[in-house]
């Protein structure tokens, strides 16, 4: 694997289990920052959800829910929280230990949980795509190879919106890229992610990424440069930092965590989305969680 630390170009694996916990659990008085981007109206909705899920237990359980058979807007946060409590109580009984000991391992319905990257990516996809007749599931999504994706990206209709979920084997990371409709000759994209900091890149909370970095556009060329570099083991750390580090700081990367990559280790799922559907899902979620 060849690594280039200084090439400058503009701005994380399948879902894994984790019990990393955030202490922020305020439910009321949520103030959502205004997006810095005027090119992408969907950013504000994802920011709203990230902020809500960082402060409301009811929204946080939606973020962490792994039941993909049910559309996100149809999930009942109270039922999900009750199911967690019942599972913890039953597990404590089965193991012969206290509820508190189980919560250390499995988490708690009474604390904000920051999910692994793959769970965040799946929930973002559901936020964009779920409706009354469709519920996104990563396991059932149609996957594209890198060459197939590049063909699709080269011919995306400019007047339509697209969302891309990426499993990036080189970084050991999953993330989502938003391609909003545009009237500009060049198409901007926007990256959404969370990261527990267990791989190449450092920890970043979903809310922090959405409020600090997500509204900074990246180009199709920048995205392709990263994909090709990973696939060919031509690693540009500065490019990775600019895309995936909240401050673009290459010194925060751990190059020793890079995985020697084969193209087949990428997993791409590309969908067209309707902005009104995203707006509707967020409106329902806010009603359920406020």
UniProtKB/Swiss-Prot annotation:
Entry keyword annotation includes Hydrolase: yes
Primary site of residence: secreted
GO biological process terms on file: symbiont-mediated perturbation of host cell cycle progression
List of catalytic residues: 117, 173, 193
One annotated Gene Ontology cellular component of this protein: host cell nucleus
Enzymatic reactions: L-glutaminyl-[protein] + H2O = L-glutamyl-[protein] + NH4(+)
Pfam family membership, one: CIF
Region spans: Disordered: 1-26
InterPro entries listed in its UniProt record: Cif (IPR032278)
Keywords, alphabetical: Host nucleus, Hydrolase, Secreted, Toxin, Virulence
Compartments it resides in: Secreted; Host nucleus
Effect of residue 195 to N: Does not strongly affect ability to mediate deamidation of host NEDD8
Entry EC no(s): 3.5.1.44
GO molecular function annotation: hydrolase activity; toxin activity
Family, similarity comment: Belongs to the Cif family.
Cited function: Protein-glutamine deamidase effector that inhibits the host cell cycle and other key cellular processes such as the actin network and programmed-cell death. Acts by mediating the side chain deamidation of 'Gln-40' of host NEDD8, converting it to glutamate, thereby abolishing the activity of cullin-RING-based E3 ubiquitin-protein ligase complexes (CRL complexes). Inactivation of CRL complexes prevents ubiquitination and subsequent degradation of the cyclin-dependent kinase inhibitors CDKN1A/p21 and CDKN1B/p27, leading to G1 and G2 cell cycle arrests in host cells.
Name under which the protein is recorded: Protein-glutamine deamidase Cif
Organism: Yersinia pseudotuberculosis serotype O:3 (strain YPIII)
Gene (name only): cif
């Amino acid at each position: 694997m060849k690594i280039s630390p200084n090439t400058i170009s503009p701005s994380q694996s399948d879902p894994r289990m984790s019990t990393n916990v955030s202490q922020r659990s305020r439910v009321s008085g949520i103030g959502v920052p205004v997006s810095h981007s005027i090119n992408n109206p969907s950013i504000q909705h994802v920011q709203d959800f990230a902020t809500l899920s960082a402060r409301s237990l009811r929204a946080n359980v939606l973020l962490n829910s792994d039941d993909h058979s049910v559309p996100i807007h149809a999930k009942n946060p109270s039922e999900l929280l009750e199911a967690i409590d019942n599972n913890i109580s039953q597990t404590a009984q089965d193991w012969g230990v206290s509820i508190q000991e189980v919560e250390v391992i499995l988490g708690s319905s009474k604390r904000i949980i920051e999910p692994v990257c793959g769970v965040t990516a799946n929930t973002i996809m559901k936020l964009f795509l779920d409706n009354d007749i469709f519920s996104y599931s990563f396991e059932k999504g149609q996957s594209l190879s890198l060459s197939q994706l590049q063909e699709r990206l080269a011919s995306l209709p400019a007047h339509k919106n697209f969302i891309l979920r990426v499993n990036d084997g080189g970084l050991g990371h999953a993330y989502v890229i938003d391609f909003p409709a545009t009237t500009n000759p060049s198409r901007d994209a926007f990256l959404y992610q969370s990261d527990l900091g267990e791989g190449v890149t450092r920890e970043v909370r979903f809310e922090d990424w959405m409020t600090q970095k997500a509204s900074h556009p990246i180009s199709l060329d920048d995205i392709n440069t990263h994909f090709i570099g990973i696939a060919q083991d031509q690693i540009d750390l500065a490019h990775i930092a600019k895309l995936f580090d909240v401050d673009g700081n290459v010194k925060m990367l751990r190059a020793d965590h890079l995985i020697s990559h084969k193209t087949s280790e990428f997993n791409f799922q590309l969908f067209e989305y309707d902005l009104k559907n995203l707006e509707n899902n967020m409106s329902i979620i806010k009603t359920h969680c406020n």
